[in-house]
Amino acid sequence: MLRPRFNYDVIKEMMDYANLKVKEKQEEAKKYSLMHTSLLIVISNYNSILYGNVGNTRFYHIRGGYIVSQSKDDTIAQLLVDEEALNVSDMKFHRQRNDLLQAIGDFGKIKPNIIKSPVELMEKDIFCLTTVGFWENIDEHDMENDLSRFEDKKQWLNSLEKRILASLRDNIENYTIAQVEVQAVASPEPMEKDRSKLIKKIILIIMIVVVII
């Protein structure tokens, strides 16, 4: 079985690379100068997952039919929620729900929202990776209720799409949802530490020893 690298730095490296490539595209032609995008990355070692996002994509973790956690985004509305100036239930309708504080393609460095500790998997866990057009038009309770009604996950997704299309909004943003269900879980392994950082620490220790001697 393949054992991919599994740590915080892997996601950060991929985010930085994506940001670099989008900025390179911006410089190719004037028509791409305003190009920006949101990004959500999930990695796994077959026992746990780590995820991170930039922009207004969203990640949902469903266990036992209920949403047990979801990611935060980089919108002004989310900032207001974090500062307790806005109720989370009102976020979907706030006029600044799509005003981003950062996105892939921004000048300078980005600061991805990456969880610090891995989430241990359980069989039948469900993960949903979505764009803003999905989450701003779907209530989390409706996601749970529809899931309880349909054993077939395709029917569940179809029911959610119908809810989006029935939205009363004048304009519906691009809506995308990718759903993953865990069928089996591997035995646990320790999270791999970044080897390059370890080498730098070893070199630094050697240099200090040499100086002291």
Question: Regions from the language model: what does each represent?
Answer:
Residues 1-213:
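PP2C/PPM-type serine/threonine phosphatase catalytic domain
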